């Protein structure tokens, strides 16, 4: 491994290779060449090869996403405002993600699987880890977990199948959409 070469540089190279050739076609050799490391170095850093490397890339992307999301929501002191901020920011981040757009265009089946069936449990786990401290002041632990699960599924669903009438990237539209659900939750907690 050359001076300054790191796991991050290899993950960056993997991301570029995926954008260029698609997940199914990219090889360890492609990633090693793009990152300037040998196959041996790549395997030493990512034992298990391509699957382990792609898993590390997904974890990094999720971590960066939720770092940005929690930074945007920091300081919000009202539950409704928090939910709106989380939904709007997440929707805007997903829409602005060029890598995601490229991958959806070139390998929609693979990406849909990672956003839904295969990758959704991981996304919900990471979301719960990051968002619970923000949501917990307003809800019980169990309610927080369920609310985060719902928010993740809702946001991904509307990202993948946008509505003609609801824009979750718009604060006013998102607020109008979630208010009835939050009102029902508040009533259920009172009774």
Regions found by a protein language model. Give the residues of each.
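Amphipathic C-terminal alpha-helical segment
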Residues: 92-96, 151-168, 181-190
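Hydrophobic alpha-helical connector segments
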Residues: 56, 70-96, 148
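HTH DNA-binding helix-turn interface
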Residues: 20-23, 43-54
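Basic, helix-initiating cap at the start of DNA-binding domains
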Residues: 1-21, 25-34
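Amphipathic alpha-helical packing segments from all-alpha helical-bundle domains
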Residues: 66, 111-149
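Amphipathic alpha-helical segments used for helix-helix packing
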Residues: 85, 91-120
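Key DNA-contact positions within bacterial/archaeal DNA-binding proteins
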Residues: 40
């Amino acid at each position: 491994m050359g001076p300054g070469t790191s796991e991050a540089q290899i993950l960056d190279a993997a991301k570029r290779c995926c954008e260029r050739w698609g997940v199914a076609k990219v090889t360890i050799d492609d990633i090693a060449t793009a990152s300037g490391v040998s196959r041996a170095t790549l395997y030493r850093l990512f034992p298990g090869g391509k699957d382990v490397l792609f898993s590390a890339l997904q974890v990094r992307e999720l971590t960066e996403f939720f770092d940005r999301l929690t930074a945007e929501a920091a300081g919000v002191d009202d539950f409704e405002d928090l939910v709106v901020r989380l939904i709007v920011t997440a929707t805007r981040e997903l829409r602005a993600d060029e890598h995601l757009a490229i991958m959806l265009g070139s390998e929609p089946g693979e990406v849909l699987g990672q956003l839904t069936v295969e990758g959704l449990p991981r996304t919900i786990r990471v979301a719960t880890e990051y968002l619970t401290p923000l949501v917990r002041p307003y809800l019980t632990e169990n309610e927080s977990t369920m609310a985060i699960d719902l928010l993740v599924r809702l946001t991904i669903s509307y990202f993948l199948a946008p509505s003609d009438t609801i824009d979750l990237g718009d604060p006013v539209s998102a607020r109008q959409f979630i208010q009835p659900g939050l009102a029902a939750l508040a009533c259920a907690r009172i009774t």
